[in-house]
Amino acid sequence: MSTRIPLSNFLFSKNFKRILRKNDDLEFKIVKPKSNRTYYKLFKNYLKFRHSKGDMTDMSYLDFRTMLEISPVNTKILHLYKNNKFFGAMLYDVYEKSYSANYSFYNPIFKKRSLGTFLILKLIEEAKKEKIKYLYLGYYIKECKKMSYKINFKPIEILKNKKWESF
């Protein structure tokens, strides 16, 4: 089921505020996607750590570059830095009234920082500043732990029978 966050009603929970505080030493910048070997190396490290059995682990540099740079829509990357060193990123699409989070990757040695959630929270902050109405998070699959985190964002809506419903 597809999911989205209606941003006008979104409130940062205690846990989300804690994650933001825990990562307040990180800087972020939004840029147009441009691949390089540093990003690719971090991406491959992330895949090896988080998704070692997934289809993307065999992704070549050319495929990675295509994912980042070739899109029929306006795609951007939210970059994370610590002490001017690249730390992680979220690839997302920009539409008139919504953002769509596509893929995140980050340095896996910092898993206790909840960087996947942190990247979503930073994108929510940015979207709210830009008066964006929705953030689409992709599919929710209850049985898949790596995709079930999406219901932690409240309110959340799911697409059911071609209609968006609160979940």
Tell me what each language-model feature is.
Residues 98-102, 132-137:
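Glycine-rich phosphate/pyrophosphate-binding loops
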